[in-house]
Every structure is written in C-alpha cells, then in structure tokens.
C-alpha cells in the first residue's frame, strides 16, 4: 500500500514550506494497515481481505517535530486495497507456504492557505502492484510469519523531484517482513504481537532520486472475549533508516490507538476496526489513521 496521504499533504504546503520539498516519506508501506495479531497469518485456505484505509491530517512538522505551515491545512486520503491471500498446505522449513498480492485504489484531497494563495485539489488513481511470498508457523502459544515481497511501479508516478499527488511512486521496492504473536495464557485469550517490515528502495525512474530505506513496526496487545471478539490497543512506528540520494532529511512517525475485531465462524467472515493517533511526527505530516478490514475465507 502507498503512503499517499503524506505526499499529498506536503504538496499542499509547497508554497509555504519550500524547505520540505523533498521531505516525503520513502516507504511504499503505509503504517497502520495491520494491528492486533498482525503477525499471525491464517491457516491454509483462500482468502480475500479488503482493507479500507483512511488518513486525515491538519498539520505538517519539521525535522524537529514542531508544527509549521501552511494555514488551514486539511488533507484526506482513502485507500481501498483488496488483497488476495492463499495459504497452501505445502510446508517448507516446517512453515506453511503462502502467496498474496494487491493493487490499491487511492483517492486524495487537500486544501490549504499559502502565501501564493488558496490551494485545493483532489486526485484518484490506481497505485503500484505488490506481490509476496510467505511462510507461517503455529506452535503452541506462538505464531510466526516471514515474507518477502516486491512493489512494482505500475501506477502513475512523479516526473520531477519533490512531492506529488500521483498514486504510484515510480520505483521498485523490495520488502522483507518478520513477526510473531505470543499468546500469554494457554487458552490464548491474551495476545501480544509485533510485525516488522524493512523496505529496500531503488532509483525513481523519472527523477533519478533513490529514496532511503524504511523500517516499520506494527504492534498490538489484545484480549479475546466470548471467543469471537478481540479488543485491545495497537500502534505503529515508521522511520526512514537511510537518506535519499538527494540528501533530504529523514522522517519518522509513531501512533497508538484502540482496536476491536469480531469473527463470524459460520460465515467464515472477519471484521476489524482500528484508530491510530499519531502522537509524534518528524519531517512529515501528523494526523489520524482509521482502518476497516473485512476478511472472507472461501
């Protein structure tokens, strides 16, 4: 999934904050997509998981984490991400082999008052294609998962350096994933999870700028009620680890919030709703993330 929201927010601020022209996050992956038990992949089967990702922001921060212009900033992004997931019965190194992929649809709108005048605009498009292979283990009170995936630059992308409102990023990204869920009690009513992702970026095809690598941590603590409902807290931390080839400043963000999920066994259907408040952001937008996830097993 794309971190489109931040790029659009910064685009709205260009006239007021020229020093942040190249401060957009370098991650393809948008934090907050996963939450409680995010490191646990399902048992063998074919699934369609529909992510509905909302991001709002009304401020832009400098590298010190302090709020800067523009005035009356209002930015909104909605991403619909239908993910196809197949966990096979085949095992490798004791883990179930799986494959998944998605192609996101992205809508963005933003408005702001800048020294150059009032800015307002919106855009809609298809983002970059992602495909991944996974391994997953379910051992007593632990779930483990690893994955290796690639983002292909199939969507419309920027043609010049700096922020852009296009749904694609214009470069290949190779993402490595590893995570674990620990069920604290034998009944598995308490769970603690951590999901780590690292993205290696390549040169942007038009700007010839190579974005820095990015690290993302998504975590969750949850309690199961009546066997079919989970409630808990979830959060994320994302940081640009290495600098862009154009020497622009690094960025990072952290968030926390509540989550509730419910399972409908007879219908083989699962739904989760999560909110994350970004309490810290450096060299990027600071806002709110909402995620509604619908999962159906076939």
Model-derived segments and spans:
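Residues that define the transmembrane beta-barrel architecture of outer-membrane proteins
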Residues: 44, 74-82, 120-129, 170-174, ...
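Transmembrane beta-barrel strands of outer-membrane/channel proteins
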Residues: 31, 48-54, 99-107, 146-152, ...
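Extracellular loop and loop/strand-boundary signature of outer-membrane beta-barrel proteins
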Residues: 35, 66-72, 114-121, 159-167, ...
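Detector for outer-membrane/organellar transmembrane beta-barrel domains
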Residues: 145-152, 158-243
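Outer membrane beta-barrel transmembrane domains
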Residues: 28, 67, 204-298
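Short loop/turn motifs that connect adjacent beta-strands in outer-membrane beta-barrel proteins
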Residues: 24-25, 38-45, 89-98, 138-144, ...
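Surface-exposed strand-loop-strand hairpins of Gram-negative outer-membrane beta-barrel proteins
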Residues: 25-26, 55-79, 112-123
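Residues on the lipid-exposed face of transmembrane beta-strands in outer-membrane beta-barrel proteins
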Residues: 50, 82-88, 131-137, 148-150, ...
């Amino acid at each position: 999934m794309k971190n489109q929201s931040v790029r659009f927010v910064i685009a709205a601020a260009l006239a007021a904050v020229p020093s942040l022209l190249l401060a957009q996050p370098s991650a393809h992956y948008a934090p907050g997509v996963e939450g409680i038990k995010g490191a646990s992949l399902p048992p063998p089967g074919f699934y369609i998981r529909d992510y509905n990702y909302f991001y709002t922001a009304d401020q832009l921060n400098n590298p010190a984490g302090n709020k800067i212009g523009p005035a009356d900033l209002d930015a909104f992004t909605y991403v619909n991400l239908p993910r196809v997931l197949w966990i096979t019965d085949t095992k490798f190194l004791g883990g179930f082999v799986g494959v998944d992929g998605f192609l996101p649809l992205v809508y963005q709108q933003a408005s702001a008052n800048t020294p150059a005048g009032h800015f307002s605009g919106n855009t809609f498009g298809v983002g970059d294609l992602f495909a991944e292979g996974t391994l997953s283990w379910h051992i007593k009170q632990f779930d483990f998962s690893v994955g290796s995936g690639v983002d292909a630059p199939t969507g419309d992308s920027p043609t010049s350096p700096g922020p852009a409102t296009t749904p694609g990023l214009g470069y290949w990204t190779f993402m490595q994933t590893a995570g674990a869920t620990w069920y604290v009690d034998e009944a598995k009513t308490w769970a603690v999870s951590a999901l780590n992702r690292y993205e290696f970026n390549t040169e942007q095809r038009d700007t010839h700028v190579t974005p820095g690598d990015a690290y993302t941590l998504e975590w969750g603590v949850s309690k199961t009620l009546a066997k079919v409902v989970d409630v808990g807290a979830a959060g994320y931390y994302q940081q640009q680890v290495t600098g862009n080839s154009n020497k622009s400043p690094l960025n990072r963000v952290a968030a926390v919030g509540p989550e509730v999920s419910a399972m409908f066994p007879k219908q083989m259907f699962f739904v989760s709703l999560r909110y994350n408040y970004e309490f810290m952001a450096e060299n990027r937008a600071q806002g709110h993330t909402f995620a509604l996830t619908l999962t159906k097993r076939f």
